[in-house]
Amino acid sequence: MDFLFLLLERKNKHMGKKRVVLLWLSIFISFSSAEITEESPLSIGQTLSSSNGVYELGFFSFNNSQNQYVGISFKGIIPRVVVWVANREKPVTDSAANLVISSNGSLQLFNGKHGVVWSSGKALASNGSRVELLDSGNLVVIEKVSGRTLWESFEHLGDTLLPHSTIMYNVHTGEKRGLTSWKSYTDPSPGDFVVLITPQVPSQGFLMRGSTPYFRSGPWAKTKFTGLPQMDESYTSPFSLTQDVNGSGYYSYFDRDNKRSRIRLTPDGSMKALRYNGMDWDTTYEGPANSCDIYGVCGPFGFCVISVPPKCKCFKGFIPKSIEEWKTGNWTSGCVRRSELHCQGNSTGKDANVFHTVPNIKPPDFYEYADSVDAEECQQNCLNNCSCLAFAYIPGIGCLMWSKDLMDTVQFAAGGELLSIRLARSELDVNKRKKTIIAITVSLTLFVILGFTAFGFWRRRVEQNALISEDAWRNDLQTQDVPGLEYFEMNTIQTATNNFSLSNKLGHGGFGSVYKGKLQDGREIAVKRLSSSSEQGKQEFMNEIVLISKLQHRNLVRVLGCCVEGTEKLLIYEFMKNKSLDTFVFDSKKRLEIDWPKRFDIIQGIARGLLYLHRDSRLRIIHRDLKVSNILLDEKMNPKISDFGLARMFHGTEYQDKTRRVVGTLGYMSPEYAWAGVFSEKSDIYSFGVLLLEIISGEKISRFSYGEEGKTLLAYAWECWCGARGVNLLDQALGDSCHPYEVGRCVQIGLLCVQYQPADRPNTLELLSMLTTTSDLPLPKQPTFVVHTRDGKSPSNDSMITVNEMTESVIHGR
């Protein structure tokens, strides 16, 4: 049945009546029933529907697999959305499989003649029973005579919470009921992530990755979680959390306005609230939403500020425990107190303690509830308790106190609570603040005076500096060993490019524009004109000239010369007739001009150029900005690596280096380089892996989004490879020009290159061997998937990012 649905959908892809035809087909293929009894089991091809027509129970499979599951899904919605699976760990494979109700009220799934693969357990019904699918989506086993519910699916949750279903705990019995993610989007067996609520007072929600906290909601305050600022006073909460006298707590979800809504815990650890709009699923909430949501990202006594990008800070009176770790963007060691507390209860002397209040805070973990009538009493109770480090009086909760490390704290742009932190009085010295204000005022005054004075000198010297600048550039270049480098005059380049006309413009990148030109001797050239706002300064400009002039290889672009005049900086290259690789791979028409054999030749050529840079040249070069737009193609479609402005040269036995100024292109940067500034041969290997998957798929890393969950290119490539469907990643424009084995091998090589740990990636020599031989390949480990922006927009083309030298790592796009 799934195959027929898929076939019909493809045939009616551009027809407005597709959904009607699909629905009509399902009437003839699927036999619907009102209930399951001992006399009437559920077989493959049959469904059990709820009376309101919203849900149905039936058999289903993924990608036309032989493995069949029994599950509940939304009726009439294509593609199928499964909200509960009975046999999530044991699929059936026999076409004679059926779901039956036994005489004792136990619901059992038989795999044909192979026995029972799943059971609801012993229900012990004495008068017979039946199975119904309620309008809420709850599958229930009911005793026929008494009407007593013997078993229900809402007490055995999967990865989805439906309206009226509950997450719960019981203090006395230790029972817990939560959500458990699927292993993958096509494997419903239990995955790595679990959602639970805690039995503390007040309760809070936890998203766990194994046994480790991954995300925390903050304590519950009557109608909202304090760690979710979206739940403000104007928010009509569809949630409730209640406790009964038996020590049980129930977290319930209701959506009165939409029968087709759900909350899902995805295989990659994201909680999504989804509502069906008649055509598609709208995401009304998704978390974790950013790095601040990850549990304990800023460590003890640190807090994460939600900004663009998020960053960690220490509370007033605290300093980073490890400055070096904070500089690299690793904040998990947290902060330590600068001035030791001397607890004297109500003392008013120099050793007295005071409170510093921080607004818009997600309350930290490890809180304790204290009975207080108001905020003033809450503060006094904390002051009288020497172990109390902070307090908060929260509407809907009351007084919370902290005597342990303040962990997993976030500061929102709006919303949140007031957190008061206990400090030594010296941290809030009034006189010290006054001195600071006076010093700032005097400094600003002097700055303004000096500014006006300097402005006068600047105006008289600006023309003089322009002339000096050109001589300085030329002198610097002459001190370098760059034989054969030609120095061009500006008027020569202006004539060659028709004064940099738009008709001569070949493209635009992060450092400026590239123009086609023709010299008087007939030579065709490409001119890279650095923009005045370019981040490529003197160092990068010199770097590119010196490096490229000393490198000679058929797969590297050749620089002919340069031109410096005033503020203008130009690089002159050999002209590449076919421009850059991205103009073919990502263009709907031109991609047809490069079939699979040609793409495979280009892949091997890039690898040879990379091997020359890393191993075979007299200089060892790390490119640091390898991407599709930096691969140029000559008239014979031979690839040439270009743009060496960010390249670094290694000497002797050096194999890696570290920088505090991280510059590169979003999506191509390896994890260790993006977040710690560490680069090596393996950084370029990671970029090559991304580039390889782009060439295979014809999809751009920064724009690709697959399926309802919006999977990235790396995530989709991993899913295809895990399912032995590597050929599914292939660009459809390639048709039958490829060999499936060769494509699958290249997908596996790409995944080996983008592994998280640099040590797991192949070196360049191993990479070229993998591409040119048929030797066995190692199995890749799951890569780190890049997360799309929350507004659904892709970054701009080849967006560059910079991590500046700060104690708080900040990322800027360019």
Swiss-Prot record:
Domain PAN, first and last residues per copy: 343-425
GO MF term list: ATP binding; calmodulin binding; carbohydrate binding; protein serine kinase activity; protein serine/threonine kinase activity; ubiquitin protein ligase binding
Catalytic activity: L-seryl-[protein] + ATP = O-phospho-L-seryl-[protein] + ADP + H(+); L-threonyl-[protein] + ATP = O-phospho-L-threonyl-[protein] + ADP + H(+)
Membrane-topology descriptor: Single-pass type I membrane protein
Name of the protein: G-type lectin S-receptor-like serine/threonine-protein kinase At1g61400
Keyword ATP-binding among record annotations: yes
GO process terms (BP): recognition of pollen
Active site residues per record: D625
Cleavable signal peptide: 1-34
Enzyme Commission no: 2.7.11.1
Record's keyword terms, sorted: ATP-binding, Cell membrane, Disulfide bond, EGF-like domain, Glycoprotein, Kinase, Lectin, Membrane, Nucleotide-binding, Phosphoprotein, Receptor, Serine/threonine-protein kinase, Signal, Transferase, Transmembrane, Transmembrane helix
Major location category of this protein: membrane
EC category name: transferase
GO cellular component labels: plasma membrane
Location(s) in or outside the cell: Cell membrane
Phosphoserine, modified sites: S534, S549, S629, S642, S702, S796
Residue stretches making up the Bulb-type lectin domain: 35-154
Domain EGF-like: 288-324
Modified residues (Phosphothreonine): T659
Disulfide bonds: C292-C304, C298-C312, C378-C399, C382-C388
Domain Protein kinase: 500-785
Extracellular side: 35-436
